[in-house]
Amino acid sequence: MSRECELTGTKPMVGNIVSHSQIKTKRRYLPNLVQVTLRSEALDQNFRMRIAAKALRTVDKLGGLDAFLAKAKEEGLSTKALKIKRDIAKKAVA
């Protein structure tokens, strides 16, 4: 299981801890990932995903998974999220 958000593609970043004496030590900044179940109103299904807490706030702000995926660019999404996005688009056309 990778440490990557399925909706935004947020991954761990690398940086430095800098002490008072300016000694730099490498460290990793991990995304705040949470396991959540999101509901798609268009597909009438629940989806279990591992997403960043920031992405969860954005999903709530935009009004749900369907609205988030409609606005989201495809390059940050996981294969699972891409499939859900395409299924929602097909359902909207039909």
From Swiss-Prot:
InterPro entries: Ribosomal_bL28 (IPR026569), Ribosomal_bL28/bL31-like_sf (IPR034704), Ribosomal_bL28_bact-type (IPR001383), Ribosomal_bL28_sf (IPR037147)
Record key words, sorted: Ribonucleoprotein, Ribosomal protein
Source taxon at top rank: Bacteria
One of the GO BP terms on file: translation
Transmembrane spans: none
GO terms for MF: structural constituent of ribosome
GO CC field: cytosolic large ribosomal subunit
Similarity section: Belongs to the bacterial ribosomal protein bL28 family.
PANTHER family: 39S RIBOSOMAL PROTEIN L28, MITOCHONDRIAL, LARGE RIBOSOMAL SUBUNIT PROTEIN BL28M
NCBIfam families with a match to the protein in the record: L28
Name the record gives this protein: Large ribosomal subunit protein bL28
Taxonomic source organism: Hyphomonas neptunium (strain ATCC 15444)
Protein's gene: rpmB
